[in-house]
């Protein structure tokens, strides 16, 4: 049974996740002050340390600068053929919509069209558009070109992107319609994450996915993304690699079937810059960063992600639960529960078959989801979650 629900604008919910103490309002929530006046079970105060910004952050603005960031494109025809195989698999290509992000010279675009696929190319650089449009000639597939940066589409909250691009308007013009979450994959997206903004983009997509916003309004959109080895290792991390296991790994693995497809050497890619050459930054080597092998990862949203107890209406509380537990990852999980929830932690842990001494670092992604859903369906208390009121977070 779900308790009373109190909702805040998305800005507040996201702000709560991006900062220190918890400020979550959701299904069945009460302030810590109110709860402590009623507390009769001896709950201890267990204040967590805020997560570092590199792990959990709001998608802060990264709008267009005066100089465009370098972009990588497929430059090898053999690599393009392999990607066509990975993207189309054994499906009828004419029924599959492929959204290609920043195709550049169109090496992969041409290979997809030759295979008979329907391709929507989202190209941010005007320079490449005249080279993409003629590709449809003498091809079996269908091509539509959209001049926009896919990764900056549907900016969240206070981000300002020019031009302001809405997936809803674009998809409507393309004739793409939403399908139920329980249906198959309606759209596949292929892209190469910008090396300077990989983590930020992955977080932005996570919020879109759990809230069913942006491209996820249209169903279980499948991502096929080239990422750096660093982010790849973190995406697939488990408790067996505590040095890499973080909040992002839990949230992605709960939401999606994350599958490694293959590694592609850096020589398969070309690099485009606005001024035609790469410049070394003050602290690093831009050239060396771009000359790294990339890992192709498929992220397919799970049909079973949303349940009666985890939905786009309360996902922010789930995010907060995971964040809280990783704030002190080596503390017993029972201590986190006593700080997070009003329900009996011993009873909850017994139901999910976990020991009170188990730590967040030893819990697998599915354990966190099971823990959250068990608390949500508990009838021990009307108010299931405790939050701290933070006036500085109550901003739009």
Curated annotation (Swiss-Prot):
Gene3D superfamilies: Vaccinia Virus protein VP39. Pfam families: RrnaAD (PF00398). Keywords: Methyltransferase, Mitochondrion, RNA-binding, rRNA processing, S-adenosyl-L-methionine, Transcription, Transcription regulation, Transferase, Transit peptide. Residues 328-329 are annotated as: DNA-binding. Ubiquitously expressed. InterPro entries: KsgA/Erm, rRNA_Ade_methylase_Trfase_N, SAM-dependent_MTases_sf. Its EC number is 2.1.1.-. It catalyses: adenosine in rRNA + S-adenosyl-L-methionine = N(6)-methyladenosine in rRNA + S-adenosyl-L-homocysteine + H(+). It is found in: Mitochondrion. SMART domains: rADc (SM00650). GO terms for biological process: transcription initiation at mitochondrial promoter. Residues 43-71 are annotated as: Disordered. S-adenosyl-L-methionine binds at residues 74, 123, 149. One of its GO terms (cellular component) is mitochondrial nucleoid. Residues 1-43 form a transit peptide. S-adenosyl-L-methionine-dependent rRNA methyltransferase which may methylate two specific adjacent adenosines in the loop of a conserved hairpin near the 3'-end of 12S mitochondrial rRNA. Component of the mitochondrial transcription initiation complex, composed at least of TFB2M, TFAM and POLRMT that is required for basal transcription of mitochondrial DNA. In this complex, TFAM recruits POLRMT to a specific promoter whereas TFB2M induces structural changes in POLRMT to enable promoter opening and trapping of the DNA non-template strand. Homodimer. Component of the mitochondrial transcription initiation complex, composed at least of TFB2M, TFAM and POLRMT. In this complex TFAM recruits POLRMT to the promoter whereas TFB2M induces structural changes in POLRMT to enable promoter opening and trapping of the DNA non-template strand. Interacts with mitochondrial RNA polymerase POLRMT. Interacts with TFAM. Belongs to the class I-like SAM-binding methyltransferase superfamily. rRNA adenine N(6)-methyltransferase family. KsgA subfamily. This is Dimethyladenosine transferase 2, mitochondrial.
């Amino acid at each position: 049974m779900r308790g009373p629900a109190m909702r805040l604008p998305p800005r507040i919910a996201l702000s709560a996740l991006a900062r220190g103490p918890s400020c979550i309002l959701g299904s069945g929530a009460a302030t810590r002050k109110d709860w402590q006046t009623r507390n009769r079970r001896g709950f201890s105060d267990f204040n967590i340390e805020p997560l570092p910004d590199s792990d959990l952050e709001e998608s802060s603005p990264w709008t267009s600068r005066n100089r465009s960031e370098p972009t990588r494109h497929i430059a090898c025809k053999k690599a393009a053929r392999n990607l066509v195989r990975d993207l189309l698999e054994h499906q009828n290509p004419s029924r599959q919509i492929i959204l290609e992000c920043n195709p550049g010279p169109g090496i992969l675009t041409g290979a997809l069209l030759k295979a008979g696929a329907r391709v929507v190319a989202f190209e941010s650089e005007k320079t490449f558009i005249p080279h993409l449009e003629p590709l449809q000639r003498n091809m079996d597939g269908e091509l539509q070109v959209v001049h926009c940066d896919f990764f900056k589409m549907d900016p969240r909250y206070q981000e300002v992107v020019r031009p302001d691009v809405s997936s809803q308007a674009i998809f409507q013009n393309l004739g793409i319609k939403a399908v139920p979450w329980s249906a198959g994959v309606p759209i596949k997206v292929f892209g190469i994450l910008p090396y300077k903004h990989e983590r930020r983009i992955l977080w932005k997509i996570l919020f879109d996915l759990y809230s069913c916003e942006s491209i996820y309004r249209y169903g279980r959109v499948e991502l096929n993304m080239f990422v750096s080895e660093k982010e790849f290792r973190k995406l697939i991390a488990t408790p067996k690699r505590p040095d890499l296991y973080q909040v992002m790994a839990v949230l992605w693995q709960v939401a999606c079937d994350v599958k490694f497809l293959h590694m592609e050497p850096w020589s398969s890619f070309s690099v485009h810059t606005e001024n035609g050459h790469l410049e070394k930054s003050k602290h690093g080597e831009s050239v060396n960063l771009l000359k790294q092998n990339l890992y192709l990862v498929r992220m397919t949203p799970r049909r079973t992600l949303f349940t009666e107890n985890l939905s786009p209406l309360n996902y922010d509380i789930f995010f907060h639960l995971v964040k809280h537990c990783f704030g002190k990852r080596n503390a017993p999980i029972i201590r986190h529960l006593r700080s997070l929830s009003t329900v009996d932690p011993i009873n909850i842990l017994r139901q999910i078959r976990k020991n009170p001494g188990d730590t967040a670092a030893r819990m697998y992604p599915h354990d966190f989801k099971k823990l959250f859903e068990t608390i949500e369906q508990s009838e021990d208390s009307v108010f299931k979650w405790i939050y701290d009121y933070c006036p500085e977070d109550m901003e739009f």
